Design a protein with these regions (language model features):
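Extracellular interaction modules
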Residues: 1
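Short amphipathic alpha-helix
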Residues: 21-22
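Membrane-interfacial amphipathic helices and adjacent loop/beta segments
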Residues: 35-47
């Protein structure tokens, strides 16, 4: 099996629970997963947790198999307002690379114009913000090259969906994490 790599963007105000859970589960699942910050080595999350990013945002990201956009306030908005992020999302889409976004990070996909005709989901009430996609009320959705999820309570199913996109069987991981026991499906 090919080795797969994932780049997770950490904008100031990122949602810690989403971001750190995603990174943890993808690494447990055997993917090469790196976090990227924009200006500083340490990035402040929306609940004032400072986390050291693995790398600074650069052109190297284009070599990754997947780009992940977590949410957060103002993390999602900071991603949305960054033209380099919009251009990177468009690049990934044009080159048929995977893009994953959750919560407020999903609006970046709309602005980048990469979800037209694709099933997507996002934070509660985001139907009006994801108008070019086919909004569905599901926890995690994969359509063509796009993975989306709803919000702070959904990074587990989101991460499992990403692992499955890369051909990973998550059955044992779910058992080891007691995910099904805790009510996960």
């Amino acid at each position: 099996m090919l080795f797969r790599s994932v780049a997770v963007l950490m904008a100031e105000g990122y949602e810690e629970g989403e971001t750190l859970t995603i990174v943890d589960l993808l690494r447990r699942g055997g993917l090469e997963c790196h976090t990227f910050s924009f200006n500083e080595e340490f990035v402040r999350g929306m609940h004032d947790m400072y986390v050291k990013a693995d790398k600074l945002f650069n052109g190297e990201i284009k070599n990754y198999d997947m780009l992940v956009l977590p949410g957060g306030r103002p993390g999602g908005q900071n991603l949305l307002e960054n033209q380099d992020v919009i251009s990177l999302v468009q690049y990934f889409n044009e080159h048929h690379q995977y893009i994953a976004a959750m919560c407020s990070g999903t609006v970046v996909l709309e602005k980048a114009n990469v979800i037209k005709g694709k099933k997507v989901t996002g934070y509660t009430g985001y139907q009006d913000k994801l108008v070019s996609g086919d909004f569905v009320n599901e926890v995690a959705v994969f359509d063509q090259n796009i993975v989306t999820s709803q919000g702070p309570a959904t990074p587990y199913p989101f991460s499992f969906k990403i692992l499955e996109v890369f051909g990973k069987d998550v059955t044992e991981m779910k058992e080891g994490l007691m995910y099904n026991f805790a009510g996960g499906k």
